């Protein structure tokens, strides 16, 4: 054990000579080996380290000791031919593995009993070709499979490029001099406006469908008007039936598409968040007002009850 510090000191003091080069690619395994010239002396220990000052391993016969976070999974050691050759294999090369590796032999003479230690070292420069990394990336990116595509037709057809002219004939308003309410009845064929007191009855016929024939597709818009005469004036209601929902390119989250039942069109609207907030605020205000009235009433009644009990005791 006393020789180990001396041997480590010798390793740090010896300068390596120009070394041969070994070139490998990233991901490959590199095997580095060296042969000793003195074949007569006894090998006490062999060592591998990486310049400038990183000790990889120390080996004595079959015992191997790793340093500086090196493990046998990364670097394997072998010493065949009766310690004449020492070999290491660096697995899965990375750019950090490039550098100068030095192998060293520590030997003693077999003919005398002196403590003299002979030292031999040999260096090898390992070059890791980093250009292969980009080549691997290109190969991998070129072998990727494109995602599967579906041949189904879209739910809508964008007819923004289609040019069409719509002409809508607006029916004449119905004038009713009677200042009475009007009942509106819907039939499957048309929309009738009937006055409860007037003798005259008028029927608004639905205009002819409007057809847009562009790019082999048809868009039909049916527009009907309902005119109601009241005491405040004439109110005209417009109802639109779109029988080409397939070509609707805009989705409105606030409204529901018109629902057609028996030829009549009814537009159904969803409540917005603002409406619910207003309803909730009004309800909360009513509840708070009721609680306040209850508390005031309870306080007055309790005060009178206490006053009445006090007077009775007196």
UniProtKB/Swiss-Prot annotation:
Residues 1-16 form the signal peptide. Residues 17-121 form the Ig-like V-type domain. Keywords: Disulfide bond, Early protein, Glycoprotein, Hemagglutinin, Host membrane, Immunoglobulin domain, Late protein, Membrane, Signal, Transmembrane, Transmembrane helix, Viral envelope protein, Virion. It comes from Cowpox virus (strain GRI-90 / Grishak). The lineage of its organism: Viruses, Varidnaviria, Bamfordvirae, Nucleocytoviricota, Pokkesviricetes. GO terms for cellular component: host cell membrane; membrane; viral envelope; virion membrane. Residues 303-314 are intravirion. Glycosylated; contains phosphate and sulfate-substituted glycans. O-glycosylation is required for hemagglutination and hemadsorption activities of infected cell membranes. Residues 192-217 are annotated as: Disordered. This is Protein OPG185.
């Amino acid at each position: 054990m006393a020789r180990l510090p001396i041997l480590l000191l010798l390793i740090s003091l010896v300068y390596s000579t120009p070394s041969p080069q070994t070139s490998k690619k990233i991901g490959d395994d590199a095997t580095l080996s060296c042969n000793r010239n003195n074949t007569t002396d006894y090998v006490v220990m062999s060592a591998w380290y990486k310049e400038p000052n990183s000790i990889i391993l120390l080996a004595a016969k079959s015992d191997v000791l790793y340093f500086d976070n090196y493990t046998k999974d990364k670097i394997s050691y072998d010493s065949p031919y009766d310690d004449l050759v020492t070999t290491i294999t660096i697995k899965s090369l990375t750019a950090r593995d490039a550098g100068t590796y030095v192998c060293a032999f520590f030997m003693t003479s077999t003919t005398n009993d002196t403590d003299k230690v002979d030292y031999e070292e040999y260096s090898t420069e390992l070059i890791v070709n980093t250009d292969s990394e980009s080549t691997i990336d290109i190969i991998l990116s070129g072998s990727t499979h494109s995602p599967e595509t579906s041949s189904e037709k879209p739910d809508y057809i964008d007819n923004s490029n289609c040019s069409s002219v719509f002409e809508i004939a607006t029916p004449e308003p119905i004038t009713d001099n009677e200042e009475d309410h009007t009942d509106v009845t819907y039939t499957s064929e048309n929309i009738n406006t009937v006055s409860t007191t007037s003798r005259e009855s008028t029927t608004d016929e639905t205009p002819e469908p409007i057809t847009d024939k562009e790019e082999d597709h048809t868009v039909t818009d049916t527009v009907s008007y309902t005119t109601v005469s009241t005491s405040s004036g004439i109110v005209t209601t417009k109802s639109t039936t779109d029988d080409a929902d397939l070509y609707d390119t805009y989705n409105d989250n606030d409204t529901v598409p018109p629902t057609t039942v028996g030829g009549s069109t009814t537009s159904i609207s969803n409540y917005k968040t603002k409406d619910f907030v207003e309803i909730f605020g009004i309800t909360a205000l009513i509840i708070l007002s009721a609680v306040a009235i209850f508390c005031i009433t309870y306080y007055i009644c309790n005060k009178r009850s206490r006053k009445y009990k006090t007077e009775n005791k007196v």
